[in-house]
């Protein structure tokens, strides 16, 4: 085990950067240099001149939508994708100026505001499109609502059937206040080439139908992270990576051979905590509610101030570990709403105390705890690990020089 040099306390690092202290000693660290590097790597795979529109829905996969989008915009992102209207508005009000696409239907009450703020909307069925056309009929043709048609190619979740796409495109092209801006689909299983090939064939058939109808082809895009990692030829006119922007590989591709350009993807998020208490407990002491764990010897137990209300799921009880001083220690007892306990009895050196930092997600020394590892512990996927990190966990944004911003429930800096 490589010895780890302790960092200055988070309070000092923030103060040195002119930032206020955190309201608690559990926080997420978001590496903006890694974020920019990941975007550059994905752009390299997509190809020269292919627009990259990162997906920043779900609070940028738990990383913080506005700070992440602003950093990506500064790094050259061509636009962004979100899932809901208020997610798009949050970006605009946070200062994001790049184009935004909402990937799910938008209530017609917000059509006018979407057009006025330069936010594109998706349409994937006749009823929803008809309502959007009616709502947009009074819009200024000089500032039309951009509409992107979703095509059902096999995911079974939404979109126009291939046979319906040309008619839908005609309606949009002929409607006052609307502009046909895109044509997209989403893949079901990028690790299965036969399924993906069938979806690509269906998508290409839809493109051909629109071309035969004499309608100018809009921007075509199909590739999220998985498709971009497995087949860069699917870039078409743009790509919309999600998980990979944050340095993570889709779980189904964990053993796949990825493009060399993506070998340097770096996880952006780390979860760090300092104990609020470290105490010696006698043999037979029950730890946390239940209790599902009792000390088998005199033990030194550290209480970390985060729990299932923060996204550290109860399913991690007696399964997970943390890294302290470069080595792993077990997390013991049932995860509580606001606390989880670590057994630090065997940590070498001076007794662990409340100045020690614990890494629950991320790297320290030679050790790394990945989102994929945590996902396996709770029988889920990496997406759920990062998106499940609660808003009440402070986010500290940093670059090579140290902290450059933070977000808590009460303020955002940087």
Predicted regions and their residues:
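Active-site anion/phosphate-binding pocket segments in diverse small-molecule metabolic enzymes
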Residues: 1-32, 36, 40, 44, ...
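Active-site-proximal beta-alpha core segment in soluble small-molecule metabolic enzymes
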Residues: 9-13, 21-22, 26-37, 48-222, ...
């Amino acid at each position: 085990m490589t010895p780890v040099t302790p960092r200055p306390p988070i309070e000092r690092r923030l103060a040195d950067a002119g930032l206020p202290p955190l309201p608690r000693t559990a926080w997420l660290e978001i590496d903006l240099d890694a974020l920019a590097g990941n975007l550059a790597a994905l752009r390299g795979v997509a190809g020269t001149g292919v627009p990259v529109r990162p997906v920043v829905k779900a609070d940028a996969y738990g990383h913080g939508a506005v700070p992440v989008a602003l950093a990506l915009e500064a790094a050259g992102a061509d636009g962004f994708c979100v899932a809901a209207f208020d997610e798009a508005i949050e970006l605009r009000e946070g200062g994001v100026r790049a184009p935004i696409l909402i990937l799910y239907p938008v209530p017609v009450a917000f059509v006018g505001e979407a057009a006025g703020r330069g936010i594109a909307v998706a349409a994937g069925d006749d009823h929803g499109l008809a309502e959007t056309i009616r709502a947009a009929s009074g819009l200024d043709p000089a500032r039309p609502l951009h509409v992107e048609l979703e095509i059902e190619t096999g995911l079974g979740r939404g979109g126009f059937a291939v046979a319906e796409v040309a008619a839908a495109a005609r309606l949009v092209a002929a409607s006052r206040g609307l502009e046909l801006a895109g044509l997209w689909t989403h893949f079901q299983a990028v690790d299965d080439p036969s399924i993906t090939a069938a979806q690509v064939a269906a998508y290409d058939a839809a493109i051909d139908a629109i071309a035969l109808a004499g309608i100018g082809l809009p921007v075509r895009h199909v590739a999220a992270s998985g498709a971009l990692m497995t087949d860069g030829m699917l870039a078409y006119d743009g790509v919309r990576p999600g998980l990979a922007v944050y340095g993570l590989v889709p779980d189904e591709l964990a053993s796949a051979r990825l493009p060399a350009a993506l070998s340097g993807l770096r996880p952006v998020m780390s979860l760090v905590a300092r104990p609020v208490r470290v105490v010696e407990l006698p043999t037979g002491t029950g730890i946390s509610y239940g209790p599902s764990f009792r000390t088998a010897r005199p033990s030194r137990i550290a209480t970390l101030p985060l729990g299932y209300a923060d996204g550290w799921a109860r399913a991690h009880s007696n399964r997970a570990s943390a890294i302290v001083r470069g080595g792993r220690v077990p997390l013991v007892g049932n995860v509580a709403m606001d606390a989880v306990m670590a057994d630090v009895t065997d940590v070498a050196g001076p007794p662990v105390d409340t100045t020690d930092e614990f890494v629950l997600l991320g790297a320290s020394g030679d050790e790394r705890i990945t989102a994929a590892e945590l996902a396996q512990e709770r029988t889920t996927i990496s997406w759920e690990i990062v998106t499940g990190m609660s808003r009440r966990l402070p986010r500290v944004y940093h670059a090579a020089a140290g902290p450059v911003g933070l977000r808590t429930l009460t303020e955002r800096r940087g």
